[in-house]
Amino acid sequence: MSHSMSSSSSSSSSSSSSRDEGQSRLNNVLSNIAKQCRTTSAQVQDVYPCTPLQQGLFALSLTSPGAYMAQHVFRLQPFVDQGRMKQAWNVVLQKHAILRTRIVMLGENAMQVVLKQSPEWRNCSDLRAYLDADQSITLQTGEPLTRWAISDTHLVWSAHHSVYDGFSVELILRDVATAYADGEIPPRPSFRQFIQRMFQQKQKSLTEAYWKKKTAHLDEVDTFPRLPASTYRPRPNSVYKHESSLAIDGPSGVTLSTIANAAWGLVQSSHLGSEQVSFGTTLSGRNANMPDIDKVVGPTLATVPVLLDVRSSQSVADFLQATQAYFTELIPHQHIGLQNLRRLNRATEAVCNFQTLFAFQPGMTETQGQSPYGHLLTAENKDKVEAAFYSYALTFQCSLAGTGIIKVLASYDDKIISSSQMKRLVFQFEHIVSQLISSNGSKRLSEIQLISPQDLDQLDIWKRKMESYEQLLPLDAIQRHIDTRPDATAVAAWDGTLSYVELDAFATRLATWLVHEQKVGPEIVIPICFDRSQWMIVSIFGVLKAGGAFLLLDPIYPENRLRYMIKMVNARTILVSESCRARFEGVPGAILAVNAAWFETHTHASIPMRELPVDRALYLVFTSGSTGQPKGVIVTHASYAASAAGHMPALGMNENTRQLFFASPAFDLSIYEILGSLMCGGTVCVPTEEDRNGSVAPVIRDMNVNLISLTSSYARHLRPEDVPRLETLALVGEPLARDVQRVWANRLTLINAYGPAECSVVSTVKRPVTLDSNPANIGTTVAGRAWVVHPKDHEILLPIGATGELLLEGDHLARGYLNDEEKTAAAYIFGPYWAPSPTPRRFYKTGDLVHFDEDGSIVFEGRKDSQVKIRGQRVEIAEIEHHLARLFPNAAGAAVDVFKHEYHVHLVAFLFCDKESWNSSDTPADILQRLGDVNVSTMSHIKQQLEQVMPHHMVPTRYQIWARMPTSLAGKLDRKALRKELGNQSTTVIELDETSTEFPVIDSTNKVALRLNHKILDLASEEKTTLDGRDFPLSILGLDSIQLITIVTFIRSEYGAKMTVETLYDLKLTVTGLAAMITSPHDRPAEAAPTLDLSKELQRVYRELTRRSESIKHKRKVFLTGATGLLGSQILRQLLADPSVQRVIVHVRANDAAKGMARVVSAATLAKWWSSSYANRVECWPGDLGMPQLGLQPEQWRMLCGTADAGAPITSVIHNGAAVQWQAPYQALKAVNVDSTVELLTAMAQWSEPGSFTFVSGGLKRSPGQDLESFMKSLEQANGYSQSKFVAEELVSRFAGHQSTHRVSIVRPGWVIGTEKDAVPNTDDFLWKLVQACIQIGAYPAEGGDLWLAVADAEEVATRILATTFAASGESPSVDNVEIGTTVSRFWELIKVQTGMELTQMSAEDWKQAAQDFAASQESEQTFLPVLAMLQDPQMEFGVQRPANGGPPSNVNAAIRSNIKTLVETGFLSDSSEVVIVED
């Protein structure tokens, strides 16, 4: 009994304890909730979980202020009673708990809390001010999600999308109208009931399984529109509205929503060139299985990804049915929430990265459109709400009613989609909707016209604007100049000059021999292989006059490849230079060395008059082929005439043109360098192979070249100042590099030219390329017409702006491929259905992916296949993979891909193993022997084998062995995984490298070979430490032509030995072999001795004598402070560029010399000028300007004082270092800025020989006519920096006045910015900090717009500093005020134009007040320290009176523009764009 009682008592006690603990936990939770909501627990009415959508939207709003927070502005009708309206809203608020909801975080869970509250009404009489203040409120957890304000004329309801949707707005406003009329609000299901019904654990599991299955087949998902960078966050700031009517008679069984979504899928597919599209859509959620769900007030909507298969081969009916089925199937699974979907796996994460949100709303009939609350409220800003509401790059809202009215409201980020492009997208969407509605269901998707009628009209307009020119056949064009300008120079070569009449005479004699002795005529191809000379040009012209066609061969190509091409053209005669004759020994047919000696014995000139067909072959050029062998392109006289008629004027070619023959003869660019120059009546300038492969700048100068065509890779090694008379630079063969554009765009006429060999060299030209041009823009067609089609189906014409394959049409198309009808038919197509014509129209499929820009020009995006450009020449990856696979037949696979490192493009080869061939414990040699030939066991063996069958530029430079082949979800080779591995190597990948044991050590006595080894490895783009001191073949490094040219130039300057690049292409040439050729000239291959132009040689030698004399006369040793800053780095650069400066000692704040030097190199690398060749002329002394004796070592201090025993004395000091701190007082800066100057002058006073001291000043400057006393008085209230620089400068000035031994200079720069060319501004500089602050404030001080802003780029200031430092004479101290600059108004105009922002002008005082107010809330932000300094410094000015000699050099404004552009691109200068609404 007692046990029973005891047991009962214990149970009761336990239950009571549990209840107490539960109540305690509940109280704690309620207390936490109340704290987050800043209220009391008694005010909490209900708590329940958020939907995934609510949680996602709320999270986005926390990271993107303003997102998903809408301000609904209503105009009150005149009779509306304000008090009664407020009471009506109070009733509705109590009726619908969702309007009293807030969101809090309990652990990791987002919960919605319903409070017992009434709305807090604010006044919005000043509507604009209220909206601005309301919009600035930052959303936080526990904060109200709805706010209200009212005035006599307006009511504002601000609401977060987590508490309402479009249906809810209508229901709420209807209830407000009912309550205003004292009616009874009908009962509605609560949002809590919706959550309980829809979000169950069982459904969650089913939903996750559904989405995993739905995305399992995905390979990769592309987004539309594409973002400019992965870190870019879209900000929709523009709206486009459009309305039109369509005939509605759609397919039965398909909803209008289905048609709209299917149409958008086609739009997106057309712009991405993808058959798998993904975009987001917002579903109402009102189709779920719940009674009266259409009456729920709350956000029942759901955002989900839409995945559509847009294969062009399927029927329209099948596509529409599949689209409708997609939406039907996902109804039970629509509420998963994007944030939850992302977490499932890689595929589901990818489909959530969409940037287009497509929303369809059924259109309302006229009766449905009548508002039950319109007599009370009228919405005023609905469109603007939608524009700023979402965070996607594009939100496309569409309504389509049975009446045929289609309405579109698109909100978009205009930095990603322009307004004109947005219009085109809407027109295209409307056009596709119309076709889907009216089409026969059996029609294929490929038959749906994706381009709108408006786009077709625009293409025709662009075509009509093209200029047309006279077309002359090459021989006719050249003959015109022979007849009218016989004495004009046709060829200016290193070995002679030929006038047009002389060229014709020699060519006629050669043609006579070819016709009579070799039976040359139409369609007979003559290979021509020369080291560059005048006789090569004669040979080309001679073949043409004989009626034949020519094939230019590059002597450096592998012998196997040369012989293959000769065999392909069935050559019976080959024309060569004497130096190339040996390469063709044993080749069937006549080998003729064309030179002066031959013409001495062949004087007969008689060619029979014949009518020759215009479509006969003019020349052949071989390009890389995917089958392992090159393919020959046949260009006819007529096709080249059509091309030349357009590209010669586009390139600016005329009778005054002097064009350098620079391209490889194997590159079709060489054709227009030669034939184009002659056809326009210009001059072909022919350098020696040695000069062409060395430094080309002297060649350009000596030959007065005014037009040259280069790849960006090569142009990067030229400087404008080295070729001052060069007028036009055409960049060809590879994408235009941005850094090259910055250097050249404003220095001459810069051109971006594009054209496949199959279309006669040049097809499009962008002229001129400016600093603002898109480097990927290849211009407009110069011959024929361009079209953009679907990459997988040329029967589908794409709209303007869509990415697709470029098709070229016109008379300039080549005949086709030699002996390959199948490839010709695949590449040259006739009459796609969108190009109807009585006669078939012919098009060439380039394989290049492009899109039309808004002005009709073409923007290059890449390749649709594996073809790439290496050093300007086209390379089929498949051809390399073919030869690699033949070398390793036992491999599970082989692949080649492109790897970009800095400015270099490399080919990387991959070999894949299987379980049998891979063993991680084996050496690479063991694995290679299992995969292929036992004789190929090292990386160098592989390269040597490949170079026997392919040109040097096609041989990969890196090699990897993989344990297995990486595959995508679709089972294909995953090339992305290959590229990722290149930067992050795993244990299942072996990187091949030359092993040190494979190559012998170079004898320590062979100094030349060791020096070459060091130089060559320095040039290699990747570290090869295992080859240090080893004797290896040069070919294994995969050096490109520019690197080989550098070696040739080095050998010439270091050892005086002449060498050609062709020599270095020898596969077996080793380091010691190259050294032997230098030290023993007789070991070098014999070259034809060129004739010597004594006049030019004398000029060259005298220039060299003058340069050396000046250098010997002034051997300088300079001590420089502040070398790591923007200006200091530029000073150091110019010192090292001066041959008279033997050594520069840089004083750097660092713990040791190595770290100090690293800082110097880092600054110089950032400024894009550092070269390892400078290292031996720079010495780093670590120290601290603020310490006694500058913190130097005793011996270093003695050297600075000139009292050390050893070493050449220091001859100049440039004191550029200083401490710049915005708010530091004088005493804090004195040690660095003043005491360091005392130390340096103390050291200099001990020099026994005259020297120079230059002080770089700063801070406030004395106004013209201002006496010293008043200036010093004004400085008493200035900042510490200005005070310290003044004291230091005055100290220098007085030191100069008390001695006469040394030359003392003071340079006073204004604001120093980055150069126009490199545009590397110092973001810590006061000027840019001020601009940044003004942009964020939204205003700038504009008082005195005509005042002067002294600003110059670092290069200009450094030049002035060195000029005064090394001046031979002049007063001491000399003072150089760098007063070049621009007006204050012009400066701010440049800021506004370059950033695209509208900034408000203010007076100085008003701006200071605005800045003070703004900075008050930003005191912890470093950005506003300069602003605070300005506010606190009464002497700080926004500009000065324009000096008498103040004037901007031509590049100041350009430099400012360039700096601003860099600051915008890096995000340092950012804006907040306003919403712009555009309506039809």
Swiss-Prot record:
Thioesterase (TE) domain: annotated span: 1117-1436
Keyword Ligase in the entry? The reply is yes
List the effects observed when the gene is inactivated.
Answer: Eliminates the production of fellutamides.
Cross-referenced InterPro entries: AA_adenyl_dom (IPR010071), ACP-like_sf (IPR036736), AMP-bd_C_sf (IPR045851), AMP-binding_CS (IPR020845), AMP-dep_synth/lig_dom (IPR000873), ANL_N_sf (IPR042099), CAT-like_dom_sf (IPR023213), Condensatn (IPR001242)
Q: What triggers its expression?
A: Expression is positively regulated by the secondary metabolism cross-pathway regulator scpR.
What does the record give under GO molecular function? ligase activity
The record ties this protein, via Gene3D superfamilies, to: 3.30.300.30, ACP-like (1.10.1200.10), Chloramphenicol acetyltransferase-like domain (3.30.559.10), N-terminal domain of ligase-like (3.40.50.12780), NAD(P)-binding Rossmann-like Domain (3.40.50.720), Nonribosomal peptide synthetase, condensation domain (3.30.559.30)
What UniProt keywords are attached to this protein's entry? Ligase, Phosphopantetheine, Phosphoprotein
Region described as Condensation: spans on this chain: 44-458
Q: Where is the composition biased (Low complexity)?
A: 1-17
Question: Which residues are modified to O-(pantetheine 4'-phosphoryl)serine?
Answer: 1041
**Pathway connected to this protein:** Secondary metabolite biosynthesis
Stretches the record annotates as Adenylation: 479-871
Positions of the UniProt region annotated as Disordered: 1-24
All residue ranges annotated as the Carrier domain in the record: 1003-1082
EC number(s): the record gives 6.3.2.-
Q: Does the keyword Ligase apply?
A: yes
What job does this protein perform?
Nonribosomal peptide synthetase; part of the inp gene cluster that mediates the biosynthesis of fellutamide B, a mycotoxin that acts as a proteasome inhibitor. In the first step of fellutabmide B biosynthesis, inpC activates 3-hydroxydodecanoic acid to generate 3-hydroxydodecanoyl-AMP that is then loaded onto the T0 domain of inpB. The 3-hydroxydodecanoyl-S-phosphopantetheinyl-T0 is sequentially extended with L-Asn and L-Gln by the two CAT modules of inpB. The linear lipodipeptide from inpB is then transferred onto inpA for the addition of the third amino acid, L-Leu.
What is the UniProt domain comment for this protein?
NRP synthetases are composed of discrete domains (adenylation (A), thiolation (T) or peptidyl carrier protein (PCP) and condensation (C) domains) which when grouped together are referred to as a single module. Each module is responsible for the recognition (via the A domain) and incorporation of a single amino acid into the growing peptide product. Thus, an NRP synthetase is generally composed of one or more modules and can terminate in a thioesterase domain (TE) that releases the newly synthesized peptide from the enzyme.
Q: Family, per the entry?
A: Belongs to the NRP synthetase family.
- Protein name, per record: Nonribosomal peptide synthetase inpA
Name the species this protein comes from: Emericella nidulans (strain FGSC A4 / ATCC 38163 / CBS 112.46 / NRRL 194 / M139)
